[in-house]
């Protein structure tokens, strides 16, 4: 289903409330990776464009406690849970609530104890276009106290998709990031980006940040408070820039090193797209020092994202 007014149009799918295409008319270029064949999204292992939940990213040991009650979740990455479990929101068929030329809203009702999470959760995902700005608004209500962390998992490439993302310039408005252990889960230690390869406070070419010990990124950056934007991406080849803003405290910057997909019609290689997953912190349900991802029945989960696309002149 296509939607859009002005310089940008988008296509999305009801499976996983997935963002399938973001087409920039001025340059006649699609800016995100997709699987090409819609039927392939029944097994979207790389989560291309998907809405991930109930809890995107990782929760250690696939469990958390609420009010003294221990909830055991479905494991799908060793002993841990990633992106909501074996059958997360990315694999669900979402219903269309309303739509127009400029927007569409999907919703999905997750039953109590689905993948082990407490409470019936009613979630919605609204995609809208105005001029060259793509907005994503994620909402959720629960019947029981639970934890929620919904993200959009689009892989961006401003260089006509076929090439890797190494030559993109990236700026991330973060003075700190979370240290990961060998399972890619935060240890709880907050580290300054100063003097490290994780310093993207100024626009930096991705490949210039690599070292003999570091050839990829998959970390949660802690967004500076009162920031006007979270990240900016720029391509000197296509002369396109992307500015990302959100109300979330973190962003997972992932350079697509685990990408792998091949059929007769489509091949996607590692490093061909990068993700900027605005989010609550990974494993926050088990770390009281992290911003809370807890949602009570009296509350509404609200996650807003804007992608502003411009031609560099």
Residue ranges and their predicted role:
Residues 70, 74-131, 280:
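Extended, loop-rich substrate-binding clefts of extracytoplasmic carbohydrate-active enzymes
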Residues 25, 137-165:
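Acidic (Asp/Glu-rich), glycine- and aromatic
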Residues 158, 162-211:
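A conserved active-site cap/scaffold subdomain adjacent to cofactor or substrate pockets
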Residues 195-313:
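Active-site pocket scaffolds in enzymes
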Residues 16, 110-112, 129-131, 140-144, ...:
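Beta-strand elements of well-folded, non-transmembrane domains
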Residues 34-89, 185-186, 190-192, 198-199:
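Active-site loop/turn microenvironments that scaffold catalytic and metal-binding pockets
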Residues 63-65, 114-120, 128-129, 287-301:
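Exposed beta-sheet edge/beta-hairpin loop segments within beta-rich domains
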Residues 1-9:
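Single conserved hydrophobic/aromatic residue that forms the stacking wall/gate
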């Amino acid at each position: 289903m296509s939607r859009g007014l002005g310089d940008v149009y988008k296509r999305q799918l009801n499976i996983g409330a997935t963002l399938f295409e973001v087409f920039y008319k001025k340059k006649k270029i699609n800016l995100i990776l997709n699987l090409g064949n819609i039927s392939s999204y029944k097994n979207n292992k790389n989560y291309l464009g998907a809405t991930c939940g109930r809890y995107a990213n990782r929760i250690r040991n696939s469990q958390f406690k609420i009010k003294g009650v221990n909830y055991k979740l479905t494991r799908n990455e060793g002993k841990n849970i990633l992106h909501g479990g074996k059958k997360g929101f990315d694999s669900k068929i979402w219903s269309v609530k309303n739509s127009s030329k400029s927007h569409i809203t999907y919703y999905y009702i997750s039953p109590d104890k689905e993948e082990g999470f407490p409470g019936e959760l009613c979630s919605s995902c609204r995609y809208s276009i105005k001029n060259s700005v793509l907005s994503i608004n994620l909402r959720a209500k629960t019947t029981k106290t639970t934890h929620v962390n919904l993200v959009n998992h689009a892989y961006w490439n401003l260089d006509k998709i076929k090439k890797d993302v190494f030559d993109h310039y990236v700026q991330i408005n973060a003075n700190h990031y979370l240290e990961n252990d060998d399972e890619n889960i935060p240890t709880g230690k907050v580290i300054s980006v100063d003097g490290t390869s994780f310093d993207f406070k100024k626009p930096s070419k991705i490949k210039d940040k690599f070292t003999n010990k570091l050839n990829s990124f998959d970390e949660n950056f802690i967004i500076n408070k009162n920031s006007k934007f979270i990240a900016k991406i720029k391509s000197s080849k296509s002369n396109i820039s992307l500015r990302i803003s959100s109300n979330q405290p973190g962003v997972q910057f992932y350079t697509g090193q685990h990408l792998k997909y091949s059929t007769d019609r489509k091949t996607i290689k590692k490093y061909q797209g990068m993700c900027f997953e605005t989010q609550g912190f990974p494993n926050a349900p088990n770390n009281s020092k992290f911003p809370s991802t807890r949602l009570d029945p009296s509350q509404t989960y609200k996650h807003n994202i804007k992608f502003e696309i411009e031609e560099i002149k």
